[in-house]
Amino acid sequence: MRVVLQRSKEASVTVDGEIVGQIPFGLTLLVGITHEDTEKDATYIAEKIANLRIFEDESGKMNHSVLDVEGQVLSISQFTLYGDCRKGRRPNFMDAAKPDYAEHLYDFFNEEVRKQGLHVETGKFGAMMDVSLINDGPVTLIVESK
């Protein structure tokens, strides 16, 4: 499982002109799932993200988690995170999980994040989405389970 995490001042995702998910501040997650991922991977990533200290304390040091600052999470599925661009000029997506499996694991992952005590908004799985955010910092990290 691969997640691109962005600390966000605000974020939203729109499908067909309608906002389907929106947060005032917190973390924007682009979530990629490979066919080898399991629920154990999803739980690991959810716990890691909820407790990752990437928000600044009063002295400007990254010392607080999204839980500590009472932020929210916008989670967006993105199979293209498993695109392999090493050969040719078109990405190969063979490492991305099949849609049925990926959707199940994506939903499970979001529930695991909620179990950590976070409010989670989502995009629409498999849809073409417009994602808008103000990246705070910018702070952008890649979190992987393997």
Curated annotation (Swiss-Prot):
Pfam families: Tyr_Deacylase. It is found in: Cytoplasm. It catalyses: glycyl-tRNA(Ala) + H2O = tRNA(Ala) + glycine + H(+); a D-aminoacyl-tRNA + H2O = a tRNA + a D-alpha-amino acid + H(+). A motif (Gly-cisPro motif, important for rejection of L-amino acids) lies at residues 137-138. Gene3D superfamilies: D-tyrosyl-tRNA(Tyr) deacylase. InterPro entries: Daa-tRNA_deacyls_DTD, DTD-like_sf. Transmembrane segments: none annotated. Its main location: cytoplasm. The keyword Coiled coil does not apply. Keywords: Cytoplasm, Hydrolase, RNA-binding, tRNA-binding. Its EC number is 3.1.1.96. The keyword RNA-binding applies. One of its GO terms (cellular component) is cytoplasm. One of its GO terms (molecular function) is tRNA binding. GO terms for biological process: D-amino acid catabolic process. It comes from the Bacteria. An aminoacyl-tRNA editing enzyme that deacylates mischarged D-aminoacyl-tRNAs. Also deacylates mischarged glycyl-tRNA(Ala), protecting cells against glycine mischarging by AlaRS. Acts via tRNA-based rather than protein-based catalysis; rejects L-amino acids rather than detecting D-amino acids in the active site. By recycling D-aminoacyl-tRNA to D-amino acids and free tRNA molecules, this enzyme counteracts the toxicity associated with the formation of D-aminoacyl-tRNA entities in vivo and helps enforce protein L-homochirality. Homodimer. A Gly-cisPro motif from one monomer fits into the active site of the other monomer to allow specific chiral rejection of L-amino acids. Belongs to the DTD family. This is D-aminoacyl-tRNA deacylase. The gene is dtd.
